[in-house]
Amino acid sequence: MTLIVTGAAGFIGANIVKALNERGETRIIAVDNLTRADKFKNLVDCEIDDYLDKTEFVERFARGDFGKVRAVFHEGACSDTMETDGRYMMDNNFRYSRAVLDACLAQGAQFLYASSAAIYGGSTRFVEERSVEAPLNVYGYSKFLFDQVVRRVLPNAKSQIAGFRYFNVYGPRETHKGRMASVAFHNFNQFRAEGKVKLFGEYNGYAAGEQTRDFVSVEDVAKVNLFFFDHPEKSGIFNLGTGRAQPFNDIASTVVNTLRALDNLPPLTLAQQVEQGLIEYVPFPDALRGKYQCFTQADQTKLRAAGYDAPFLTVQEGVDRYVRWLSGQV
């Protein structure tokens, strides 16, 4: 049976395609916005059956042109949290997603989709409950609104619907994201260009570089998606993060030490890195005051209750792997 991955040439989508290939799955229809032709580079080492534009795909899928479709991994979306065009965001992230969901329900296909931790906005609790969901931007709102549709549909759905609220994802195949790429990606490139990594100084009670995020490797994101793919009886909306909040200092320090290791240099403590000017703290920008999350941490209770029991990579493990991969691409 056919598998479909939307956003297949994007960051998470391409990693899911690659993970499916590693399991021997090659009957994959890759869907993306083909107006950005250069994104195909993420699929060069992948095996797929077809590569379709997102608009053509929705029309053909609704008509049943692809025969029996087992599952759709719906990763296609505008993920730019700074985007301010509400019409574009709602068309791309909400209405498009509804059309794909409707086609999956009509054809009995599994529907696994990308939600986002941006739904939580400025909340200090990160649990899949309506009471703590308060998005701060139109991107988060578009994801929030679609999750509400899913909640209404789930009780009567005859096929799987599984949504994943991604926290701060990093890893291979994100180069095309530019300014929206992960902190690890930017730290790597900054260190190679300038010989140091710059982090925000103290803010809102957090010491310099100690603002924290739940940083999750795209390797783990792909594994969770495939776990639910293997268990079509499991539906719901789930946080997808490590359950650990780690400071930006951990990312920067791991980037520095991994690059040092590749140059056969010994590791340094964070204090030594700061003392030697390898990590530098800059004043917290006024433009971000009051709009910046200093803490995110996924509540994994629901994910673990669904049966996913594999450990998640720490920042030290995942970023080390990622930096070595990036170094091999240069």
Curated annotation (Swiss-Prot):
The active site is at residues 139, 177. GO terms for molecular function: ADP-glyceromanno-heptose 6-epimerase activity; NADP binding. It is an enzyme of class 5 (isomerase). Binds 1 NADP(+) per subunit. NADP(+) binds at residues 11-12, 32-33, 39, 54, 75-79, 92, 143, 169, 177. Its cofactor is NADP(+). SUPFAM superfamilies: NAD(P)-binding Rossmann-fold domains. Substrate binds at residues 168, 179, 186, 200-203, 213, 292. NCBIfam families: heptose_epim (TIGR02197). Contains a large N-terminal NADP-binding domain, and a smaller C-terminal substrate-binding domain. This is ADP-L-glycero-D-manno-heptose-6-epimerase. It comes from Burkholderia multivorans (strain ATCC 17616 / 249).
